């Protein structure tokens, strides 16, 4: 069982990282809420991890905090919710927002996540309600908001050319597809979130936040 990983960030794509640990490269899948907090390529990264073994694959999932890892582990215990859907949930909302959804039984907001319909949302609330409430103090203790990396800061100062804009759009669409959104929906979400964004991470964050707000 690999429950924590610390190494050098070699590759950084939305939802997937490559981390060098003493010469061995580990592919780690992460929710966007963790991706937003990452530093530049070649920087040190530390993540709490959960190792999933299936018949056709072995996958490592990483999280910025132990609390997010615990929430992920509770999510995948819910009937009908696998690791991919759990990652999609924690990409569209942080642990605090998820707790609010559970407390308020906000099925409509939960159903904005790809792969979750109303019935699955209702089952999720029923099965995870007590467990998440017990974790409420840990969840609320986490600092709110996301960390702006030096890479994001530098990107915000750089001019956005047509080529760069297309690259950002395509990368954003690919990330949304990886989270389970359909091609048409992913393109629409990315297009509406582009604005003056200068990084794919910024577009993805706005797209996911826009999806949540539209259901409120």
Curated annotation (Swiss-Prot):
It is found in: Cytoplasm. Residues 144-163 are annotated as: Flexible linker. GO terms for cellular component: cytoplasm; Holliday junction helicase complex; Holliday junction resolvase complex. SMART domains: HhH1. Residues 65-143 are annotated as: Domain II. InterPro entries: DNA_helicase_Holl-junc_RuvA_I, Hlx-hairpin-Hlx_DNA-bd_motif, NA-bd_OB-fold, RuvA, RuvA_2-like, RuvA_C, RuvA_C_sf. GO terms for molecular function: ATP binding; four-way junction DNA binding; four-way junction helicase activity. Keywords: Cytoplasm, DNA damage, DNA recombination, DNA repair, DNA-binding. Pfam families: HHH_5, RuvA_C, RuvA_N. Residues 164-216 are annotated as: Domain III. Its main location: cytoplasm. Homotetramer. Forms an RuvA(8)-RuvB(12)-Holliday junction (HJ) complex. HJ DNA is sandwiched between 2 RuvA tetramers; dsDNA enters through RuvA and exits via RuvB. An RuvB hexamer assembles on each DNA strand where it exits the tetramer. Each RuvB hexamer is contacted by two RuvA subunits (via domain III) on 2 adjacent RuvB subunits; this complex drives branch migration. In the full resolvosome a probable DNA-RuvA(4)-RuvB(12)-RuvC(2) complex forms which resolves the HJ. The RuvA-RuvB-RuvC complex processes Holliday junction (HJ) DNA during genetic recombination and DNA repair, while the RuvA-RuvB complex plays an important role in the rescue of blocked DNA replication forks via replication fork reversal (RFR). RuvA specifically binds to HJ cruciform DNA, conferring on it an open structure. The RuvB hexamer acts as an ATP-dependent pump, pulling dsDNA into and through the RuvAB complex. HJ branch migration allows RuvC to scan DNA until it finds its consensus sequence, where it cleaves and resolves the cruciform DNA. Belongs to the RuvA family. Has three domains with a flexible linker between the domains II and III and assumes an 'L' shape. Domain III is highly mobile and contacts RuvB. This is Holliday junction branch migration complex subunit RuvA. It comes from Francisella tularensis subsp. mediasiatica (strain FSC147).
């Amino acid at each position: 069982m690999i429950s924590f990983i610390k190494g050098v960030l070699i590759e950084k794509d939305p939802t997937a990282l490559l981390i060098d640990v003493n010469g061995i490269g580990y592919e780690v899948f992460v929710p966007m809420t963790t991706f937003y907090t990452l530093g530049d390529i070649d920087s040190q990264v530390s993540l709490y991890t959960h190792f999933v073994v299936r018949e056709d694959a072995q996958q490592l999932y990483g999280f910025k905090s132990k609390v997010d890892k615990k929430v992920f582990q509770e999510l995948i215990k819910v009937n009908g919710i696998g690791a991919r859907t759990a990652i999609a949930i924690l990409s569209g909302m942080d642990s605090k927002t998820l707790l609010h959804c559970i407390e308020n039984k906000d099925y409509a907001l939960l159903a904005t996540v790809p792969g979750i319909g109303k019935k699955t949302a209702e089952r999720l609330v029923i099965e995870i309600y007590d467990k998440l409430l017990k974790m409420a103090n840990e969840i609320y203790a986490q600092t709110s908001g996301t960390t702006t990396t030096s890479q994001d800061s530098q990107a915000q100062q750089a001019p956005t050319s047509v080529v760069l804009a297309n690259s950002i759009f395509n990368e954003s669409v690919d990330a949304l597809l990886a989270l389970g959104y359909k091609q048409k929906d992913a393109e629409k979400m990315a297009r509406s979130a582009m604005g003056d964004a200068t990084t794919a991470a910024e577009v993805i964050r706005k797209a996911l936040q826009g999806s949540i707000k539209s259901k409120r």
